[in-house]
């Protein structure tokens, strides 16, 4: 699906339309619908950890979230090898409104959200043993870690 960018992705202020493709329940691809860059791997944060934040009023207005029922929150992941070294930006989530095909990036204040990081390793949540068995990587919640 192609989304109109209402509040730009940091560093890519001139990008107006982005295409979102689902890979599986955890991963998605997002790329410029009108050019070659940028392209990102996104993750569903809710499959990895408890994740919650307040959406700023300006973003609610831009995306017309008052009556929206079909929303997606995703975070950008920087891919590394091995995969458990890949990092997730939990401080700048992307919000997608499927009702009107708009999207925006929200930049959270780290002082208000001290448990979120710009570059948190997915290895904190990623079950490497399951991945090595050839199965889809099983998310590991903090409560499951020893």
From Swiss-Prot:
Gene3D superfamilies: BH3618-like (2.30.290.10). It is found in: Cytoplasm. GO terms for biological process: bacterial-type flagellum assembly; regulation of translation. Coiled coil: none annotated. Pfam families: FliW. One of its GO terms (cellular component) is cytoplasm. Keywords: Bacterial flagellum biogenesis, Chaperone, Cytoplasm, Translation regulation. Signal peptide: none annotated. Acts as an anti-CsrA protein, binds CsrA and prevents it from repressing translation of its target genes, one of which is flagellin. Binds to flagellin and participates in the assembly of the flagellum. Belongs to the FliW family. Interacts with translational regulator CsrA and flagellin(s). This is Flagellar assembly factor FliW 1. It comes from Helicobacter hepaticus (strain ATCC 51449 / 3B1). The lineage of its organism: Bacteria, Pseudomonadati, Campylobacterota, Epsilonproteobacteria, Campylobacterales.
């Amino acid at each position: 699906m192609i989304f109109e960018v209402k509040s730009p992705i940091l560093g890519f202020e001139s990008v107006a339309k982005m295409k979102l493709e689902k890979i599986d329940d955890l991963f998605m691809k997002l790329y410029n619908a009108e050019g070659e860059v940028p392209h990102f791997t996104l993750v569903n944060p809710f499959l990895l950890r408890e994740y919650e934040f307040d959406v700023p009023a300006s973003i609610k207005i831009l995306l017309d979230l008052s009556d929206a029922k079909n929303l997606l929150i995703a975070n950008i992941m920087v891919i590394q090898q091995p995969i458990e070294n890949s990092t997730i930006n939990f401080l700048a989530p992307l919000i997608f409104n499927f009702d009107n095909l708009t999207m925006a990036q929200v930049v959270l204040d780290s002082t208000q959200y001290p448990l979120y990081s710009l570059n948190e390793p997915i290895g904190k949540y990623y079950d490497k043993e399951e991945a090595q068995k050839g199965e889809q990587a099983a998310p590991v919640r903090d409560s499951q870690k020893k």
